[in-house]
């Protein structure tokens, strides 16, 4: 049995195949997922698993160089936004690198998901609870 925090074999496989600057998305239950993008659906019911739970486990396994958020999260989901910024700051300290954070419109965000290796769908049902994570290197 795998010893690490991430037990989901589909997510583990995607992360293991990421190259520098490849992207994966962690999305809420309502984010549209392009038909051409790998869909990893974790949603069981509203709120389960939560966006932050998925983010925390994925980032334990993935080296993150940069990230994209929909700019609408700032106004429409300020509590989640602040919590996410704090978690990104902790991740920077743990990884020993600065994570560039980019804000784009929600429409541009949805377009950008088409470039991602996979979209991980959480059960989160709060507005704009989505992030695109860009892979870094560990050396």
Swiss-Prot record:
Keywords: Carbohydrate metabolism, Cytoplasm, Isomerase. Its main location: cytoplasm. Belongs to the RbsD / FucU family. RbsD subfamily. GO terms for cellular component: cytosol. It is found in: Cytoplasm. GO terms for molecular function: D-ribose pyranase activity; intramolecular lyase activity; monosaccharide binding. Catalyzes the interconversion of beta-pyran and beta-furan forms of D-ribose. The gene is rbsD. This is D-ribose pyranase. The keyword Isomerase applies. Gene3D superfamilies: RbsD-like domain (3.40.1650.10). GO terms for biological process: D-ribose catabolic process. Substrate binds at residues 28, 106, 128-130. Homodecamer. The active site is at residue 20. PANTHER family: D-RIBOSE PYRANASE. SUPFAM superfamilies: RbsD-like. InterPro entries: D-ribose_pyranase (IPR023064), RbsD-like_sf (IPR023750), RbsD_FucU (IPR007721). It catalyses: beta-D-ribopyranose = beta-D-ribofuranose. Its EC number is 5.4.99.62. Pathway: Carbohydrate metabolism; D-ribose degradation; D-ribose 5-phosphate from beta-D-ribopyranose: step 1/2.
């Amino acid at each position: 049995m795998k010893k690490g925090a991430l037990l989901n074999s589909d997510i583990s496989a995607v992360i293991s195949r990421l190259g520098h600057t490849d992207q994966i998305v962690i999305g809420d239950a309502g984010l549209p997922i392009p038909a051409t993008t790998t869909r990893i659906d974790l949603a069981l019911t509203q709120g389960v698993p939560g966006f932050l739970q998925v983010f925390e486990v994925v980032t334990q396994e993935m080296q993150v160089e940069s990230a994209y958020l929909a700019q609408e999260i700032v106004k429409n989901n300020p509590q989640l936004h602040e919590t996410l910024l704090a978690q990104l700051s902790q991740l920077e300290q743990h990884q020993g690198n600065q994570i560039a954070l980019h804000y784009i419109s929600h429409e541009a965000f949805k377009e950008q998901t088409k470039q991602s290796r996979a979209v991980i769908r959480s059960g989160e049902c709060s507005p704009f609870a989505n992030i695109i994570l860009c892979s870094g290197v560990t050396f």
